Amino acid sequence: MEKKLLREGPYADFFSQGVQVGNVLTMAGQIAVDDNGNTPDDLKSQMIMCYENILKILDHFGGTLENVIDETWFVTDIDECMENVSEIFAEREKIYGCKPEVSQTLIGVNALVQPNLKIEIKCIAHIEK
């Protein structure tokens, strides 16, 4: 089995940001931390930054958001997410450029890797070789 890997960032020695086998690309969960280590305070801004990181991975493997087939969102405050779901999903549609045609799972968690994080997004994409 041939694997194509993307290892970068501060944890490159520990895991890959993306792994492609055949036409399937799995991505590590993406968090809202920029290249300088900064994280926005609010959920919507963190979601936007997660997608910015997802776009970088997709681009590395020759894909776009059109290739995403599945998303899993991990959020630390499910109530906050659901109270703002219309605004958050409207912003998500802007990022995708359309209503996303993906399966999606939303999971509430007690914590993420850093205490100020509110969301982590993990995606699977199908990219033709």
Model-derived regions, located:
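N-terminal presequence-like segments and the immediate start of the first folded domain
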Residues: 1-69, 75-129
